[in-house]
Regions:
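Structural/interface elements that position substrates and couple domains in central-metabolism enzymes
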Residues: 1-199
Length: 199
């Protein structure tokens, strides 16, 4: 998938020393206050999300964190995953940390623009400390007045699924309206204008 301007962002931030890559998890998180988990959750044979990558990394984090961290789940995950991540980290540490659900709403081919100018940022946390840290992180990206929406972790996890389902419902609905317009000789573009009203 081609993402316009992504290559320039990579080059600029690598040259300026703001973006580096490593396979050494311990050194990667040593100075980080916020750790983003953006891991695959492929469907299993029964269709459920495979959380083994997320839970595995969470366990590894528990073994190596030395000070407070905010662990942010960006992946599309089932409701209750933040609790599982929290438990996986807790098995290996007594150090304070918080788990946040921060689902992404990026469109393919528009990911850079959607990230830099989000129409909304959803943050699920029950921790006031994590809330303040996440608010500070996203402040530069919501200057145009688009909201940061705070809620609990479970609600944030469900929000991603709800948004996906709502989009699919809108597309299906408009396809049905287009079929109806074709059969009745109506103009689908004129009918589509109903979205602008309060109907």
């Amino acid at each position: 998938i081609y993402e316009p301007h992504l290559d320039q962002l990579f080059e600029r931030n690598i040259k300026q020393g703001r973006l580096t890559f490593t396979t050494d998890l311990a050194s990667a998180i040593e100075k980080a206050k916020i750790i983003f988990l953006a891991l695959p959750t492929p469907p299993g044979e029964d269709g459920s999300a495979d959380l083994s990558y997320i839970i595995g990394v969470a366990g590894d984090l528990g073994k190596i964190i030395k000070d407070y961290k905010v662990i942010v789940d960006k992946s599309t995950v089932p409701v209750g995953t933040a609790d599982k991540v929290r438990e996986a980290v807790k098995k290996h540490t007594t150090i304070e940390f918080d788990v946040v659900s921060n689902p992404e709403f990026l469109r393919e081919g528009f990911a850079v623009d959607d990230f830099l100018k989000p129409d909304r940022v959803v943050i699920g946390t029950s921790s006031e400390k994590a809330r303040k840290i996440m608010e500070e992180l996203y402040k530069p990206y919501v200057r145009q007045g688009n909201p940061i929406i705070f809620m609990d972790e479970r609600s944030a996890e469900l929000t991603k699924y709800a948004a996906n389902a709502f989009l699919a419902t809108k597309i299906t609905f408009m396809n049905e309206i287009a079929n109806l317009c074709e059969k009745l000789g109506a103009d689908v573009d004129a009918v589509r204008g109903l979205r602008a009203g309060r109907a």
